Amino acid sequence: MIAEEWADAAAYLTLARRVQGRESAILQKMGQQEQSHMACLKGMYTLLGAGRPEIPAPQPLDRAPIGLLLRRCYGREMRCLAQYESRSSDPEYGQVFARMAQQEREHCRQILELLGSLPADK
């Protein structure tokens, strides 16, 4: 999950530089939230006594169309959402997972909104 959050954070922050206005602000905020999720997951990993996780850096984004990159992000968001929801009953970290699931759900909605507002050639 950490690697997927890192990939999403990198994608959103990169895409925020490729668009303007409201769309850029939305992507910037989503990128920051994904960075927060990544830090929380690393913190849990550390508290569980597993040390610091070794996470490979995300692949650099290609210059693919924005719509295609957002579709990839949507898939990762859905996978993370399922993982967080399944862990939301954890007695120790359940509330954290529930909050992250709520944010992932909102990211899915925002991605769909962004996809719906893109010009046909993007």
Feature locations, PLM:
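Non-heme di-metal
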Residues: 1-122
